[in-house]
From Swiss-Prot:
Name this polypeptide is given: FMRFamide-1
PTM-bearing positions, type Pyrrolidone carboxylic acid: 1
A GO BP entry: neuropeptide signaling pathway
Family, as annotated: Belongs to the FARP (FMRFamide related peptide) family.
Presence of keyword Transferase: no
UniProt keyword Magnesium present: no
Keywords for this protein: Amidation, Neuropeptide, Pyrrolidone carboxylic acid, Secreted
Domain of life according to the entry: Eukaryota
One cellular component term from this protein's GO annotations in UniProt: extracellular region
Organism: Sarcophaga bullata
Length: 9
């Protein structure tokens, strides 16, 4: 489950 997918630079 992509929980911290917002950290994809």
């Amino acid at each position: 489950q992509p929980s911290q997918d917002f950290m994809r630079f």
